[in-house]
Amino acid sequence: MNIRTLEPDDWPALAPFLHAHNVASARCLHSHTGTTAAAYRQELAALAPDEACFIIAEFEPSCAGVMGAEFSLESKRAWLRGPVLDATLSSAVATEVRDALWRRLSDVLPAAIERLDGFLDISNVAGLEWYRRCGFTEQAHYFIYEAQRGPASPMMPDNVHAAAESQHASLLELAHLVFPSGYLTDSELTAANNDQHVLLVMAEGDRVDGYVYANIANANTDDAEVYVDYLVVRPDARGRKLGRTLLQAALSWGFSERGVSKAALTVASDNANAQGLYASVGFKLFATGVPMRLDRGANSIKTTHSN
């Protein structure tokens, strides 16, 4: 078996393999970037070379498996992709390939990364068991919802707007209050809106009562979608339908302004109120995700063959 760390120019070539094998009961949700090889290829090509890495396992001349990660040095976190394996591998060989990929990935990830997060479909039993054997702990589950654009796209509410610079302090205070371990950095939350992402707020003066952050995934492909990363309402402002209004704003931006035909979001499995909101505007359950987490320490990284 040959293990290689890929150069960024080689990442898009992984698309056909990932499209073929990241499916059904073997799915890694961090790796799921669309329903076509073209969507995978475009997303891989768009990754920042200094914020990701990919490892490939080969039994010449064929690819046996892929594992990678996106990472942020600012937040000291990495979001793992895979391992995604050739579905024809035996159980014993699959374990060998997973271990080899993990050993190399552990070596090439920046030493500054302290927290590693995997995210597998709940039906990926073999993958989840492997993560547990490597020392990862299972976190609370999440539901992934999807919605299709209807014949009439929602209008942008008049009381929703981009955050002013004077509102950034309140915005960040709210983000840290509600999602202290959120994956978006302060600089990402306060960056200027563009064609790829938007952050919109509802506020009274400089006090932000709620915000929504959304991005366009797989732009310019048939799998383009508006993904709602965060929908946040200040605890003492709840009950005023701010969440519904902010969600409408995100869908208006994605459907009307950016012209995509699909939306997606993730919600905690125990957040019944949010699930009810999403269902009421047409979102349907796509998958149940199981987060797996490892905080790196001197002895925290191991493989299934470690004692």
Where are the predicted features?
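A short beta-loop-alpha structural element at the N-terminal edge
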Residues: 2-18, 158-171
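Active-site rim helix/loop that mediates acceptor-substrate recognition in acyltransferases
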Residues: 18, 22, 28-54, 179-200, ...
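Conserved donor-binding loop and adjoining core beta-sheet/short helix segment
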Residues: 29-100, 212-229
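Conserved beta-strand-loop-alpha-helix junction that forms the acyl-donor binding cleft
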Residues: 85, 116-127, 264-275, 292-298
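Conserved acetyl-CoA-binding loop-helix of GNAT-fold acetyltransferases
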Residues: 91-107, 133, 230-233, 239-252, ...
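Conserved active-site alpha-helix within GNAT-family acetyltransferase domains
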Residues: 122-140, 244, 269-287
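Acyltransferase donor/substrate-recognition loop-hinge adjacent to the catalytic core
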Residues: 129, 133-174
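Glycine/small-residue-rich hydrophobic helix-like segments
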Residues: 186-253
